[in-house]
């Protein structure tokens, strides 16, 4: 009998934006391809990506990933890329329109949550996110602590 492939392996995730889940409430997620140059994809495969300050924008009916740092490829010499250049996101026209409508609301933005490889192609998980206020963050932390305590108590019984 053939071995079944796991749907999601942890080693295909190249970068994760943990700060985004803390600072934003993610309303919806969309998987997007990303247009990269040769030295960029080589750096991405070496996991030299920082999504921390990144965001996405819809401009001229195109989706762009901004402010994501992909380090220069070590063996890239003079053909290396600019680490902070804007990169085009590959989405269907309907998805771009839907994301554009979602970002019209006040306080809603597009943030990259995760970058991973899928069938050899780099993909970005984009989240439609709404900013949290300070008390929302504290409430989330408090709720998480309570859940941990309940789990600890239930473990003993």
Curated annotation (Swiss-Prot):
| InterPro entries tied to this protein | SmpB, SsrA-bd_prot, SsrA-bd_prot_CS
Q: Mostly located where?
A: cytoplasm
Subcellular location(s) per record:
Cytoplasm
Q: Which residues form a coiled coil?
A: none
| GO biological process, any | trans-translation
Q: Which domain of life is it from?
A: Bacteria
Gene3D superfamilies in UniProt: 2.40.280.10
Q: Does the keyword Cytoplasm apply?
A: yes
MF terms in GO: RNA binding
Keyword RNA-binding in the entry? The reply is yes
The alphabetized UniProt keywords are:
Cytoplasm, RNA-binding
One term under GO cellular component = cytosol
Pfam families assigned to the protein according to its UniProt record, in alphabetical order: SmpB
> Its family?
Belongs to the SmpB family.
The record describes the protein's role as:
Required for rescue of stalled ribosomes mediated by trans-translation. Binds to transfer-messenger RNA (tmRNA), required for stable association of tmRNA with ribosomes. tmRNA and SmpB together mimic tRNA shape, replacing the anticodon stem-loop with SmpB. tmRNA is encoded by the ssrA gene; the 2 termini fold to resemble tRNA(Ala) and it encodes a 'tag peptide', a short internal open reading frame. During trans-translation Ala-aminoacylated tmRNA acts like a tRNA, entering the A-site of stalled ribosomes, displacing the stalled mRNA.
Q: What is this protein called?
A: SsrA-binding protein
Species of the source: Levilactobacillus brevis (strain ATCC 367 / BCRC 12310 / CIP 105137 / JCM 1170 / LMG 11437 / NCIMB 947 / NCTC 947) (Lactobacillus brevis)
